[in-house]
Design a protein with these regions (language model features):
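Catalytic metal-binding/acid-base residues of hydrolase active sites
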Residues: 10, 30-31, 60-62, 98-100, ...
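Charged helix-capping and loop-helix junction motifs
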Residues: 39-43, 72-79, 111-117, 146-156
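Active-site-proximal segments of metal-dependent phosphoesterases and phosphodiesterases across multiple
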Residues: 31, 36, 101-104, 127-164
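Core catalytic region of metal-dependent phosphoesterases/phosphodiesterases
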Residues: 6-89, 161
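Active-site-proximal loop/helix segments of hydrolase catalytic cores
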Residues: 10, 16-18, 107-127, 133, ...
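Short, Asp-centered acidic motifs that coordinate Mg2+ and/or phosphate
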Residues: 23, 53-55, 128-130, 166-167
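Active-site-proximal beta-strand elements of phosphoester/diester hydrolases
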Residues: 1-10, 27, 91-100, 129-134, ...
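Binuclear metal-dependent phosphoesterase catalytic core
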Residues: 86-90, 157-162, 167, 174-208
Length: 208
């Protein structure tokens, strides 16, 4: 199964060249400021990509989904939107959640290490094969240019329970784009935009 991963396109989706694959996954921040017109433009683009399966979760910039979920979901006719839920595709159990530790008072934020955030993280089923979050786990592809590790500690702890996990896809920290394999799990920071919000990074392809 060929998984193509993107994230943090921030209104620059038209400049992204999508390679062929079986499942296309966008790990959030499709918009710049979360406006409905920005989201509609993204959906038009994402819907038009010829893939058997296209999966999307929200990111902290995607205010329209946070405030007007029903209206947004109606637009996504051939897109699988995951918000604290799973889908099984050809034997792969895929779970998506947008929640992250508080970050600059954006959408989908909860206080770091809080009970509220822990409740969201604990919903991830232990038999998940592919996990999609917007923010990274602590210490994995989560460093800013200043060297600060900004990932989620609760998410890192949860990974110990996910014995069948093959991939974890996220974005959020643009400057730590890339792939890391640890304990037989492929971690993908799929941020398309750089720290300066230039869409210079390429989609990341992983065979599962």
């Amino acid at each position: 199964m060929r998984i193509v991963c993107i994230s943090d396109t921030h209104d620059f989706h038209d400049e992204v060249v999508i390679p062929q694959g079986d499942i296309l996954i966008h790990a959030g921040d499709c918009t710049g400021w979360g406006r409905m017109d920005q989201f509609k433009d993204f959906v038009d683009w994402f819907s038009g990509i010829h893939y058997k399966y296209k999966i999307f979760i929200a990111g902290n910039h995607d205010w329209c989904l946070f405030r007007s979920k029903e209206e947004c979901v109606k637009l996504m006719n051939n897109i699988i939107y995951l918000e604290d839920e799973s889908i099984e595709i050809e034997g792969l159990k895929i779970y998506g959640t947008p929640w992250q530790p508080e970050f600059c008072n954006w959408a989908w934020n909860l206080p770091r290490n809080s009970e509220l955030l822990a409740e969201k993280i604990e919903k991830i089923p232990n038999d998940t094969n592919i996990l999609i979050t917007h923010a990274p786990p602590a210490g994995i592809l989560d460093k800013t240019l200043e060297g600060e590790s900004t990932g989620c500690e609760l998410l890192l702890d949860k990974l110990n329970s996910l014995q069948q996990l093959k991939m974890h896809i996220f974005g959020h920290i643009h400057e730590d784009y890339g792939v890391k394999v640890e304990k037989n799990i492929t971690f993908v920071n799929a941020s398309i935009c750089t720290r300066q919000y230039y869409p210079d990074n390429k989609p990341i392809v992983v065979e599962v």
